Design a protein with these regions (language model features):
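Acidic, mature catalytic/reactive cores of soluble proteins
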Residues: 1-378
């Protein structure tokens, strides 16, 4: 179910809609995408990407790339006192009229942005590929089996490497072998589906290949050099590689220590072939370090953008006498709605909570929300 749910976001959020989520997709009587979106939708799409990463459907690099595109688009959208407007056209990026600020939408988006920020910051210290890699790929395989009526597809590969999905700290060699076996098998399965499959089965087969390819690329680029260092007699003497997949911070620390030692070893190396091999290895390590540094920079940028985009002015929505938020604000008429959210059970409570946490409104506002009780008859 989670894999199929992510497929909606994966398939419909892309360049055609400026990496914003369409409000809905109509299947009948004819397929149609609603090219409009709201702040709540945008926040949900960011959290869906974060969840997809947690489930192993997206690599860290993919998560950062998709999120950066969405946040960059958000910075282009018209806002009012920091608030995103109620609706935008996802292709023109223009607001839909009448322009309106919804208290509920603003609260939902702010909460999503701040939650997303915390999730992104955790990527510094998480392994670049975790046990979720295995679980995410097996989820996709399960859907593919369902769509193709081939329950035994990839069974041997999955069984041979099931330890990857049962340990929190994945061995680098295990992940590498798993992907080396699964990718060609997935490509062969896709070729078969292109001949005998349906549109849906072909899409899922292509998705499996992409998942494998993206995971393999990230693992190879960031860590592919580690086994070469560990297996080389001269290098392994001066630097012992960890057997488990490192985090981005680990990679930066490891290469900080290793590169100066490797440079010294290269200078002292007399054999031309060995020296050439070490120079090529040094290049791969520098590429890995550069990629890790760029990913860390992207995390920093995304976190800062989230803080900035969740920073609203609340004075025009908030009634300080009652400690209540108005339902919203009509930007066209410069008019605050007279109705207020006065119940804890209302959909505005998340916005109230976030605004208090940001220090924008007093804590008394939380306790001002009504908490009516009723007799259940029990």
């Amino acid at each position: 179910l989670t894999r199929k749910t992510w497929a909606f976001f994966e398939n419909l959020i892309g360049p055609d809609d400026n990496w914003l989520p369409p409000d809905n997709y109509q299947e009948n009587p004819e397929p149609r995408i609603a090219h409009r979106t709201s702040p709540t939708n945008i926040g949900l799409s960011l959290l869906s990407s974060l969840a997809a990463h947690d489930f192993g459907y997206l690599t860290t690099l993919q998560l950062l790339d998709r999120s950066q595109k969405t946040l960059s688009t958000m910075q282009e959208l018209e806002r009012y006192k920091g608030h995103f407007l109620n609706w935008y056209h996802t292709q023109t990026l223009l607001p839909l009229y009448p322009r309106y600020v919804s208290t509920v939408d603003s609260g939902n988006l702010a909460a999503s942005l701040l939650t997303f920020k915390e999730g992104i910051l955790s990527l510094y210290t998480l392994p670049v590929l975790r046990d979720d890699l295995y679980k995410g790929l097996t989820d996709t395989i399960a859907v593919l089996r369902e769509k193709t009526k081939e329950p035994g597809a990839f069974q041997k590969i999955i069984e041979d490497h099931q330890e990857i999905g049962t340990t929190a700290s994945v061995r680098l060699s295990s992940a590498k072998t798993f992907l080396e076996k699964l990718l060609p098998a997935a490509e062969a399965f896709l070729d078969k589906q292109k001949t005998i499959g349906t549109t849906e089965s072909i899409w899922w087969a292509e998705t499996l290949v992409k998942q494998c390819s993206n995971a393999s690329f990230e693992l190879t680029t960031l860590t592919g050099w580690m086994q070469d260092v560990d297996q080389h007699p001269k290098l392994s003497e001066v630097f012992r590689m960890p057997v488990h997949i490192p985090s981005l911070n680990d990679l930066m620390n490891m290469t900080d220590v290793l590169l100066p030692r490797l440079e010294k070893t290269i200078l002292n190396e007399q054999g031309p072939e060995e020296k050439e091999w070490m120079i090529e290895l040094e290049s791969r390590i520098r590429n890995a370090r550069l990629m890790a540094a760029e990913m860390i920079e992207s995390i920093d940028t995304l976190a800062k953008q989230c803080i900035e985009l969740a920073d609203y002015q609340y004075d025009f929505l908030f009634d300080p006498a009652q400690h209540f938020f108005s339902i919203g604000y009509n930007v066209e008429d410069h008019r605050r709605d007279p109705g207020c959210y006065d119940l804890l059970g209302s959909e505005a409570r998340l916005g109230v909570y976030v605004a208090i946490a940001q220090g924008k409104i007093p804590q008394e506002s939380w306790f001002a929300l009504g908490r009516q009780l009723t007799n259940t008859g029990k």
